[in-house]
Curated annotation (Swiss-Prot):
Membrane-spanning parts: 13-33, 45-65, 73-93, 174-194
Disulphide bridges, residue numbers: none
Organism (species): Rattus norvegicus
Keywords: Glycoprotein, Membrane, Transmembrane, Transmembrane helix
Sequence ranges on the Extracellular membrane side: 34-44, 94-173
Parts of the chain on the Cytoplasmic side: 1-12, 66-72, 195-210
Assigned GO CC terms: membrane
Source superkingdom: Eukaryota
Subcellular location field: Membrane
UniProt-recorded name of the protein: Tetraspanin-31
Glycosylation site list: 109, 117, 134
Keyword Methyltransferase: no
Pfam families in the record: Tetraspanin
Length: 210
């Protein structure tokens, strides 16, 4: 059967959802690995990554079941949810690519003071830095309580803000690029589901409704 027929659309939709399932399982696995090795101890970060992985896994399972059974209702809701995810993810990805360093610095500065002292100290040890941006009274207090390895050396410690900016700039570009790529795969998924949903199953009763 030529590609574009019922079997080809079904196989393409199944393959796409298998990829989504693998990505979802990968996110859950990475979060569990990071928690197990102590790479990330924040329960909010771990919970967020696992939630995204589970959500993606559920969408993929719904799409896969809908594709295998040619289930009209499941395919309809799959298209709606995937379309909404595309709009949200596309907007977030564009924002990640468009955000400048000044805005990043403001976000980092605001986030730093929300963190608990234990989380700040953990970040300082991980990135081998002390304090955030400027030599204010608060920074001096942070520097005094800092337990990073750089405190044992004669040279002054680098401020964490500059280190965070370097990492955040690179991370935002990667996240934005990956997000845009997955956004277009979601549009492909919506198109495949719509096409497949409107096709007639050759094994079904010819007089039955689509």
């Amino acid at each position: 059967m030529a590609c574009g027929g019922f079997a080809c659309s079904k196989n393409a939709l199944c393959a796409l959802n298998v990829v989504y399932m693998l990505v979802g399982l990968l996110l859950i696995g990475v979060a569990a690995w990071g928690k197990g090795l102590g790479v990330v101890s924040s329960i909010h970060i771990i919970g967020g990554v696992i939630a995204v992985g589970v959500f993606l896994l559920l969408i993929a399972v719904a799409g896969l079941v809908g594709a295998v059974n040619h289930h009209q209702v499941l395919l309809f809701f799959y298209m709606i949810i995937l379309g909404l995810v595309f709009i949200f993810q596309f907007g977030i990805s564009c924002s990640c690519l468009a955000i400048n360093r000044n805005t990043q610095a403001d976000v980092i500065n605001a986030s730093w003071w929300v963190l608990s002292n234990s989380t700040r100290h953990e970040l300082e040890r991980s990135f081998d830095c002390c304090g955030l941006f400027n030599l204010t009274t608060v920074h001096l207090h942070d520097d005094a309580s800092c337990s990073a390895l750089c405190k044992t050396r004669s040279s002054p410690c680098q401020m964490c803000g500059e280190t965070f900016l370097k990492h955040s700039d690179k991370a935002l570009k990667i996240l934005g690029g990956v997000g845009l790529f997955f956004s277009f795969t979601e549009i492909l998924g919506v198109w495949l589901a719509m096409r497949f949903r409107n096709q007639k199953d050759p094994r079904a009763n010819p007089s039955a409704f689509l």
